[in-house]
Curated annotation (Swiss-Prot):
It comes from Halalkalibacterium halodurans (strain ATCC BAA-125 / DSM 18197 / FERM 7344 / JCM 9153 / C-125) (Bacillus halodurans). Its cofactor is Mg(2+). Keywords: Aminoacyl-tRNA synthetase, ATP-binding, Cytoplasm, Ligase, Magnesium, Metal-binding, Nucleotide-binding, Protein biosynthesis. Pfam families: Phe_tRNA-synt_N, tRNA-synt_2d. This is Phenylalanine--tRNA ligase alpha subunit. Belongs to the class-II aminoacyl-tRNA synthetase family. Phe-tRNA synthetase alpha subunit type 1 subfamily. It catalyses: tRNA(Phe) + L-phenylalanine + ATP = L-phenylalanyl-tRNA(Phe) + AMP + diphosphate + H(+). Mg(2+) binds at residue 256. One of its GO terms (biological process) is phenylalanyl-tRNA aminoacylation. Binds 2 magnesium ions per tetramer. Its EC number is 6.1.1.20.
Length: 344
């Protein structure tokens, strides 16, 4: 029995030393030291030994069990250290390699344009006002001198929720709401940036959703020359000092008189080209003197107060300034397009 125990010990230790995985070592533990293992079987046969042999064989069996256990413990520790070393080797970082550059974002071209325009008009004494995108029929139309039968109120031009609620078609309702708040006492000098919505088919120059910036100045003695001076200052600052503007007669229900405002073409410098359709001028916004009826509906006495208003499309300004040929580029989230404006 002594030879049997020593052979078991040597065989187990040899297999433990050859094992390369923890799973194999665990299997050896179960095989030799488990309840059905050979060492346990030897201990169960102790009753057949003589009284003189029992303590000797019992001590040897315990020594064999302890030797196998220590070999298993030592091997498990070695395998764990080897696993740690392997992971460290795989995850080693070469600190001498150059770091990866941090990708920087930038303002969307429309955001950059709005910020630039806001800064320009704030420098001219205007403040920024905002209003709801879901607007009432009254503020979107009636308060702006667009009666019930006006063609601009056709369902084909507007997104209605109910008969009285719609997505605003312009930021002009902010002007009407602001004038109401002042309760007939000026001055008011604001710009109103924001999203507007119209039932247009999307193409290179039209979108069902776009950005507008409108302006309003109401005070005693405001004249058309004041409007022209403000817009001239804006055009020179936004497009360049060499640019000039011209005012053409037009019609808007909420202004009287009304004008379309053009800026001199920056490509041909007024000589005529494909971009300006050989006219030397490019339309940039609509404007005019606030209609007396609009002043009156907002609580101002048109005999005491006058004012001007203007409205411009942010996408159009961006397209003209940066040479963008399709309004849809602003809304496709193409990183190749947007990356060009990181410094804008």
């Amino acid at each position: 029995m002594r030879e049997q125990l020593e052979a078991l010990r040597d065989d187990a230790i040899k297999k433990i030393e050859q094992a390369q995985e923890k799973k194999v070592v665990q299997e050896i533990r179960v095989k030799y030291l488990g309840k059905k293992g050979p060492v346990t079987e030897v201990l169960r046969g102790m009753g057949k030994l003589s009284p003189e042999e029992r303590p000797v064989i019992g001590q040897l069996a315990n020594d064999v069990r302890e030797a196998i256990g220590k070999a298993i413990e030592s091997k498990m520790e070695a395998l764990e250290q080897a696993e740690i070393h392997r992971k460290l080797q795989e995850e080693t970082i070469d600190v001498t390699l150059p770091g990866r550059p941090v990708l920087k974002g930038g303002a969307h071209p429309l955001t950059a344009t709005i910020t630039e325009v806001e800064d320009l008009f704030i420098g001219l004494g205007f403040s920024v006002a905002e209003g709801p995108q879901i607007e009432t029929d009254y503020y979107n139309f009636e308060a702006l001198n667009l009666p019930k039968d006006h063609p601009a109120r056709d369902m084909q031009d507007s997104f209605y929720f109910t008969d009285e609620l719609l997505l605003r078609t312009q930021t002009s309702p902010v002007q009407a709401r602001t004038m109401e708040k002042y309760k007939g006492k000026g001055p008011i000098k604001i710009i109103c940036p924001g999203k507007v919505f119209r039932r247009d088919d999307d193409d290179a120059t039209h979108s069902h959703q776009f950005m507008q910036i409108e302006g309003l100045y109401v005070d005693h003695g405001v004249r058309m020359s004041d409007l022209k001076g403000v817009l001239q200052a804006f055009a020179k600052s936004f497009f360049g000092e060499e640019r000039s503007i011209r005012l053409r007669p037009s019609f808007f229900p909420f202004t009287e008189p009304s004008v379309e405002v053009d800026v001199s073409c920056g490509i041909c410098h007024g000589d005529g080209c494909r971009v300006c359709k050989q006219t030397g001028w490019i339309e940039i916004l609509g404007a005019g003197m606030v209609h007396p009826r609009v002043l009156e509906m907002s609580g101002f006495n048109p005999n005491e107060y006058s004012g001007f208003a203007f409205g411009m499309g942010v996408e159009r300004l961006s397209m003209l300034k940066y040479g963008i040929d399709d309004i849809r580029h602003f809304y496709t989230n193409d990183r190749r397009f947007l990356a060009q404006f990181k410094r804008v």
